Structure formats: structure tokens, C-alpha cells
UniProtKB/Swiss-Prot annotation:
GO molecular function, one term: large ribosomal subunit rRNA binding
One Gene Ontology cellular component annotation held by this UniProt entry: cytosolic large ribosomal subunit
Function: Forms part of the ribosomal stalk which helps the ribosome interact with GTP-bound translation factors.
Entry keyword set: Methylation, Ribonucleoprotein, Ribosomal protein, RNA-binding, rRNA-binding
Name of the protein: Large ribosomal subunit protein uL11
Domain of life: Bacteria
Keyword RNA-binding: yes
Record organism: Cupriavidus pinatubonensis (strain JMP 134 / LMG 1197) (Cupriavidus necator (strain JMP 134))
Any GO BP annotation: translation
InterPro entries given in the database record: Ribosomal_uL11, Ribosomal_uL11_bac-typ, Ribosomal_uL11_C, Ribosomal_uL11_C_sf, Ribosomal_uL11_CS, Ribosomal_uL11_N, Ribosomal_uL11_N_sf
Record PTM text: One or more lysine residues are methylated.
Record-annotated disulphide pairs: none
Family that this chain belongs to: Belongs to the universal ribosomal protein uL11 family.
Complexes and interactors: Part of the ribosomal stalk of the 50S ribosomal subunit. Interacts with L10 and the large rRNA to form the base of the stalk. L10 forms an elongated spine to which L12 dimers bind in a sequential fashion forming a multimeric L10(L12)X complex.
Length: 143
């Protein structure tokens, strides 16, 4: 018989930097889960990633105080800012442009995000990434 699920916890944690302090500790502690066990497992799985890159994670908590977690790809906005070489988007995205990325960079981001996007094909995924970039004040060359 399957374990009884008592809840899901959604967090964004920097790769390789999970520790018992907020937001991880309180979120897991409320469900009675072993915080250090999660931190060690998460840090081990994010070892190959760029340190500090925010990674969305969905933790499934079970009634017997065990858990499983699924990591998603980093947010598109973080990848776009990294590709454009900017620290933050434009406060007026439709008038003030803060950077630019090429279509090739947008394709690379779309491939990295492909599992989490609902796009039918790569071209649709690239257009989704381009739309996110435009809403941040970053132009996409070649589209």
C-alpha cells in the first residue's frame, strides 16, 4: 500500500546551500521532517550545479515522517539575467532596455527549461523565453 501524503512543500533554495535556517528549517519542521537529512540529500544532488543558483524543489511529506523531493530547473528569469550579464531587470521594461541576448542563448535556456515548460516544441519554448526576457527589459536578437 502507498504511503499517506500529508502535504507538499515548495521552496526555492540556492544550489548546494541548503541549511536548517529559514526558509528550509521552519517549512520542514512544521511537518515533523528530518531537516538535516533533507539538507544533506539536497546539497548532494545539487553538487554539480553552479553554487548559489536558485533551484525550485517540491518536497512530498508522508505521514510516517519520511519525504521525497523533486528538483525543477532554475527559474527562467535567473538564466536570462545570467545570459544577458545583468543583475536585475528594467523597472520600465517596454521603454528602458537593460541588456540583450541572442536567439542562440534563448534556445540554450529553452533547452535547459524544456522539462518544466508546457511548450509543444523548441521554437514555442524559445518564444516563451523571449517573452519573459522582453518583460524584463531585455531584447532578444534574431526573433
Amino acid at each position: 500500500m502507498a504511503k499517506k501524503i500529508i502535504g507538499f512543500i515548495k521552496l526555492q533554495i540556492p544550489a548546494g546551500k541548503a541549511n536548517p535556517s529559514p526558509p528550509v528549517g521552519p517549512a520542514l519542521g512544521q511537518r515533523g521532517l528530518n531537516i538535516m537529512e533533507f539538507c544533506k540529500a539536497f546539497n548532494a544532488q545539487t553538487q554539480g550545479m553552479e553554487p548559489g543558483l536558485p533551484v525550485p524543489v517540491v518536497i512530498t511529506a508522508f505521514a510516517d515522517k519520511s519525504f521525497t523531493f523533486v528538483m525543477k530547473s532554475p527559474p527562467a528569469t535567473v538564466l536570462i539575467k545570467k545570459a544577458a550579464g545583468v543583475t536585475k531587470g528594467s523597472p520600465k521594461p517596454h521603454t528602458d532596455k537593460v541588456g540583450k541576448i541572442t536567439r542562440a542563448q534563448a534556445e540554450e535556456i529553452a533547452k535547459a527549461k524544456n522539462a518544466d515548460l508546457t511548450a509543444a516544441d523548441l521554437d514555442a519554448a524559445v518564444r516563451t523565453i523571449a517573452g519573459s526576457a522582453r518583460s524584463m527589459g531585455i531584447t532578444v536578437e534574431g526573433l
